[in-house]
Amino acid sequence: MNNNWHARSRVSVQWTSGGLLTLILLLLMVVVPQVRADEVEAKVVYHADFSDPRRFSAMLTSINNMVNHYANNFIDYDVRIVFVAHGVRFVTDDKLSGTPFAEDKPLTEQRENLRGRLLTLAEMHNVKLELCNITRSQIGLAEDKLYRQVELIPSGVVRLAQLQQEEGFAYIKIE
């Protein structure tokens, strides 16, 4: 009789240990958020289609504040700037003479500062710079005149719609 009880208690303890382990694993699956390695928590696209250097400066400040917040809080992010029309002024050092986007005095005075801040965001914070190729080709700007960090996209407005609709990006335009 004693041997029978001992066998039953050992089976009971084994089942209880296995059951407890199973229960813990099930709870962890429910409680711990499932984040895939390739999943980005924050996706934001900025629309730059304006010519005002002060407005561009404000946008760069906004982006810098955003990426620093994400980095300080260990939040994976994908931040992009899509440049369309007048925005082309900010991704080249070409004066764009004879085009509707020609450099003016305010841009000349701020270009070095704006370039440095933009390229720092691209190189140090992985902010992606995307330029509408329709804009570039319509003014005859050679690709080698663009900052090397700039990626050409077929259409800026199509890209903005795609990022928002298909990829879940938040849209920001600095006014």
What are the residue ranges of the model-derived segments?
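Bacterial N-terminal signal peptides that target proteins for export
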Residues: 3-21
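Detector for intrinsically disordered, low-structure N-terminal pre-sequences
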Residues: 10-12, 29-34
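Bacterial N-terminal signal peptides
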Residues: 18-30
